[in-house]
Amino acid sequence: MLENENQLTHQFPTLSRWNPMFISDVHKISFHPHLQRYIGFWMGFPIRWIQIVGYIAAIDIYEGKHVLTVDDCSGMVLRVVFIIQDDFSMSKRAISMSPGNVVCVFGKINSFRSEVELIAQSFEELRDPNDEWKAWQKRMRYKKNLTKISKNHHSIIRTPKKSYFPKDHAKELLKCIRQMCKLNVQAGFTIEELIIYLKAKELHLPLVHIFNVENEIVENCDGNHILALNFSLQTLLQHGRIVRKSNSVYMLVTSKDIIRFVIPLMASGLLEAHKVQSIVRDSNPMFITLPLSAIAKHICQFLLRTKGKWRQAKKYTWVRDNQFV
């Protein structure tokens, strides 16, 4: 039984590494409606990040995104999506390619309209034919090794019986934590205190869907069970809703924790989330886990409440609008 995503990643290195795959195998990835659309299963292993190599068969331009259709001669093609807002320069470089160019693409799988596509994270053009051949051999070896591992449950990568993907549970748990900590946020809380609070208030969290990897059956876990609570706490940690004060003590992250570092920077007329993130992390080691997206959310909500008019210049960057000054 897995207690958190770190353990899941330890049991399944395929979940956190780049997996070199043939496009025909990418289309064999299965998704489950109760799991995140960015996580699928291939040969019994959970998978998120993949690497493909092939030639560009088509280039399409849409509002907000560019799409390359890539063919690796394995029998199928794959849509590779470049989100303009995420990386403008990479998206621009992608459409500067020509059909027939061979590219190596790293990306995150996505279930879209019952099909699998790749959300590009990075890519490069392969000009040397030997590189394409080496990439083909690399995929053959990787698939062969995974096939051996999947047949041997005593190998380094062992198939756990169950993996957990709470969604609504984490949201409801966060509401309970906020209510529990509203009198003294800085004191923090332990999972034992959380269980006692839920019992005292007779609160019942929603069931957590449990996907049994071996038989592909979705089971349910009681929302107040320590296993469900542990995994949802890890989810809240990843999204920057809480931080660790110590190994067993968590603390709720509030807007005040972030905004006190934002206000001194406002005089310059420029706010950059990554700069605020750096200052916040330097202020206290426990904030090291705060992701950029969480910092940006607090900044955005604060700017909406301020009298001065600010506008978003680009992702995670805001400037004061001079016409309102």
UniProtKB/Swiss-Prot annotation:
Domain of life: Eukaryota
InterPro entries to which the protein is assigned, alphabetical: NA-bd_OB-fold, Stn1_N
Listed GO CC annotations: chromosome, telomeric repeat region; CST complex; nucleus; telomere cap complex
Subcellular location: Nucleus; Chromosome, Telomere
Presence of the UniProt keyword Membrane in the record: no
Annotated region of DNA binding: 50-126
One of the GO BP terms on file: telomere capping
Pfam families in alphabetical order: Stn1
Subunit structure: Interacts with ten1.
Name assigned to this protein: Protein stn1
Organism: Schizosaccharomyces pombe (strain 972 / ATCC 24843) (Fission yeast)
